[in-house]
Amino acid sequence: MNKTILFLLLGVSLSAVAQTDALKAKISKSADKIEGQVIAWRRDFHEHPELGNNEVRTAGIVANYLKSLGLEVKTGVGKTGVVGILKGAKPGPVVALRADMDGLPVVERTPLAFASKVKSTFNGQSVGVMHACGHDSHTAMLMGVAQVLSSLKNELKGTVKFIFQPAEEGPPFGEEGGAELMIKEGVMENPHVDVAFGLHINSQTPVGTITYRPGGTMASVNDMRIIVKGRQAHGAYPWSSVDPVVVSAQIINALQTVVSRNLNVTEPNPAFTISEWTVYSDATNNLISHPNSPKIAPNDFNPNLR
């Protein structure tokens, strides 16, 4: 297990534990000891990914392991979320460590021995499921941190709340989920969280390197759908139709000018992107469809721009 990443995760609790060379050596030894287990967890989660609000298997493995460590465990938080509470032997702050658990509706095309072959349904369509964003690693890493900190319970000043979040990529369309629902259901209370930390792996960052910056580090994402209603006709008689596919194409092109011609780059955090993920129509190949639905994903660091 990469010690730099482990120390980052443990650092929030090292503020509550005497920061001595002996303690750091103990943590390093513990990290080495559980490296194989963390890798095994990660590969298992990678092979068995689950979509947002459906992380039943993953949540079960997490909850059972936290219970085996003697933690107070709450399940079903924000639908499939898991929360573990570790109370140190000494008084101190409440620190939350958070990892996400959900996979993505993506077909895995890798030669890995533990590649996902999972199929599921997403927004009414049959899809492959893959941990394409590293949440398998996040979950396994936080389980490892829970084990290390549990072994330091007698030296711990304060409480650590381990939050395993579902639906970080967003819940299915029309459903609640993710961090917002967990907060609504009280995940930051009982006990009240004084400070919370999370991280995200990044394949573009060299191994052993941690990157950070003031303010937002990763952009938010929004889910938007546009329904274009036309008039259906046979493809041989396009003049009898109002073709929503052609209209959708013009909308998609025009959306690019939202950023290039309407964004004030002198404002704070001007970074903003708009990506068109899918265009869906239910017509056969010889019909001009009636409804057509482009799916749009704006990304930003500034809610005012959104």
Locate each region found by the language model.
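Short glycine-enriched loops at secondary-structure junctions
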Residues: D100-G103, T110, V221, E276-Y280
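Histidine/acidic-residue-rich, glycine-tolerant segments that coordinate divalent metal ions
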Residues: K119-M130, D136-S137, V148, N154-E267, ...
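Metal-dependent amide/peptide-bond hydrolase catalytic core
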Residues: Q19-A22, S68, V246-R306
